[in-house]
Amino acid sequence: MLDNVLRIATRQSPLALWQAHYVKDKLMASHPGLVVELVPMVTRGDVILDTPLAKVGGKGLFVKELEVALLENRADIAVHSMKDVPVEFPQGLGLVTICEREDPRDAFVSNNYDSLDALPAGSIVGTSSLRRQCQLAERRPDLIIRSLRGNVGTRLSKLDNGEYDAIILAVAGLKRLGLESRIRAALPPEISLPAVGQGAVGIECRLDDTRTRELLAALNHHETALRVTAERAMNTRLEGGCQVPIGSYAELIDGEIWLRALVGAPDGSQIIRGERRGAPQDAEQMGISLAEELLNNGAREILAEVYNGDAPA
């Protein structure tokens, strides 16, 4: 392969392509003369649209095909939405760069109502996420929550067609696609704790590819990486994928990491919450110890049910 060419494996959804172009532009700005090519591909998660993610099962629904391209040397890096990245990587691959985080909050989107609390009883709310579902159901048990799959444009069309009274999407995705005007309210973490890594873009590559790792170093955002490290450590201990009722959000405040997390029964009947504060260098250990606390406080039983009896040890 030519020394001045770098190939990016990406999904073909508008949001995935935005992320790939974002990384491409950053790389070319940092390394004049570098030629960056996109290698678009379709993942299993893109194809299975008629089934809720939690029922499809498996981890890495949106990344596996991209990882195969890396292993077969058809691409040099894969660009992912961090909330889709599994906790484990195929041998020889790893997450080497996390870019600066966009707003990680969930967005309340509706054509008729200004806020979640303004929805009348019996309103239909669309979301594809068990994490969002359990928090919505806890706060508003009088709402009807229905599955909503597809890319951002598809989901907005279903709302506009009247299938839903409101839908919940990620603020980051809407902003990146130039659809910020559709956001009626950004939900604070106290109402909807974000997904692990939500709003951050991660870059995966072959661990022995020194040249590519050196090119990517300039794109790593230290604060975002610290925060996502704490969130992912917790998720790893919980054996969480991208379709489980787990929320985790870390902030860096006055030089200290504040990590909040939850595990919820999908129907909102029970949500186990916890938090930790500590030094940035302890980010990983904080995540693990918070996960242990959640497991001991009832999360193990909730996850066993979601995972069909296969609970974290």
Curated annotation (Swiss-Prot):
GO terms for biological process: protoporphyrinogen IX biosynthetic process. Keywords: Porphyrin biosynthesis, Transferase. It catalyses: 4 porphobilinogen + H2O = hydroxymethylbilane + 4 NH4(+). GO terms for cellular component: cytoplasm. Pathway: Porphyrin-containing compound metabolism; protoporphyrin-IX biosynthesis; coproporphyrinogen-III from 5-aminolevulinate: step 2/4. Gene3D superfamilies: Periplasmic binding protein-like II (3.40.190.10), Porphobilinogen deaminase, C-terminal domain (3.30.160.40). The modification S-(dipyrrolylmethanemethyl)cysteine is found at residue 242. Binds 1 dipyrromethane group covalently. It comes from the Bacteria. The keyword Transcription does not apply. PROSITE patterns: PORPHOBILINOGEN_DEAM. Tetrapolymerization of the monopyrrole PBG into the hydroxymethylbilane pre-uroporphyrinogen in several discrete steps. Monomer. The porphobilinogen subunits are added to the dipyrromethane group. NCBIfam families: hemC. This is Porphobilinogen deaminase. The lineage of its organism: Bacteria, Pseudomonadati, Pseudomonadota, Gammaproteobacteria, Enterobacterales.
